[in-house]
UniProtKB/Swiss-Prot annotation:
A Pfam family matched in the record: MJ0548_C
Species classification: Archaea, Methanobacteriati, Methanobacteriota, Methanomada group, Methanococci
Residues annotated as signal peptide: none
Organism of this sequence: Methanocaldococcus jannaschii (strain ATCC 43067 / DSM 2661 / JAL-1 / JCM 10045 / NBRC 100440) (Methanococcus jannaschii)
UniProt name for this protein: Uncharacterized protein MJ0548
Length: 293
């Protein structure tokens, strides 16, 4: 769903990228049919895309808020296209004055890295957009090394303006440029990719923690006999535990302090979320959360 155009040469580096993401939900077979027609250029408008998606019973979500290109420093720009599924596949282009790198990443592994020097143009995107952009560049790109950076920016903007009719490209786009050479180019790339891997690790931990929290929430007792009063405290039956808070790693208790009008030997029940003494309407309260073990 992307279009990224990157120029690098003796006069600097320029990168432009659209912001569109399209998500497909439905049968894999029909998704492939829709994607093939979309990326081949057969579908020529959002209206046509929505109509065919409805016909194929595919739900599509279009978002135009992903910044695919960025300026890492005053000497390096970067762009990324990605495919997220069971595996996360990324292709990144980094550029500085007179140099660029193309990096392929699979999940948390760099699978390929190519460094190019001198001047050139890198176009990333689906095959239809890539072909159209390259056709436009043939007319002007040979003059880029002799142009001021601003003029190159304008030329790349013009290509985005010409292609934004296509449903895989957003109407808005981002352009960044630098005119300095980064002597530690490969080190900058390494650190930037390491930050991606750290982010992915943090995200994994957050998802694990979220899963733990949801598991706890789903185990909160709504109904049932949970324990008995002994020595003025609630002693929970084997199937239950008490926790101090909804958290991935809460403190766990089998005996807890409770408040209410009760006596030793009373059985405590939970009915529709309310804790009380069995056979009475005497409510019992505690600062703890009772969950299934």
């Amino acid at each position: 769903m992307s279009l990224i155009i990157c120029y690098y040469g003796k006069n600097g580096a320029v990168i432009g990228g659209d912001r569109r993401q399209i998500f497909f939900r439905g049968s894999e077979e029909n998704r492939k049919i829709l994607e093939e027609k979309l990326y081949s250029g057969e579908i020529k408008s959002e209206e046509e895309l929505y109509k065919l998606a409805e016909k194929l019973n595919i739900k599509i979500i279009i978002e135009d808020d992903r910044e695919k290109v960025r300026k890492i420093s005053d000497s390096v720009v970067c762009g990324e296209v990605r495919s997220l599924g069971i595996d996360a596949k990324r292709r990144r282009v980094y550029a500085t004055k007179g140099k660029c790198a193309i990096v392929d990443i699979l999940n948390d592994t760099v699978t390929n890295q190519t460094i190019k020097e001198g001047f050139g143009i890198v176009v990333l995107g689906n095959r239809f957009l890539k072909k159209k952009a390259e056709e436009e560049l043939k007319r002007t790109a040979k003059l880029f090394p002799m142009m001021p950076i601003q003029q190159i920016e304008d030329a790349i903007k013009e290509i985005f303006e010409k292609l934004k009719w296509h449903p895989t490209v957003s109407k808005e786009y981002d352009i960044y440029s630098v005119n300095k050479y980064e002597k530690n180019f490969e080190e900058v790339i390494k650190k930037d990719i390491e930050s991606l891997f750290k982010y992915r690790e943090q995200l994994r931990k957050q998802l694990i923690d979220f899963g733990k929290v949801m598991s706890i929430v789903n185990k909160i007792v709504k109904n049932g006999e949970i324990g008995v009063i002994k020595d003025g405290k609630l002693h929970l039956y084997d199937d239950y535990i008490a926790i101090d808070k909804i958290d991935p790693n809460p403190k766990v208790f089998k005996v807890v302090d409770v408040e209410g009008n009760f006596k030793d030997g009373d059985i405590v029940v939970i009915e529709n979320g309310d804790m009380k003494i069995k056979g009475t309407n005497e409510k019992v309260t505690t600062k703890y959360i009772i969950i299934h073990k």
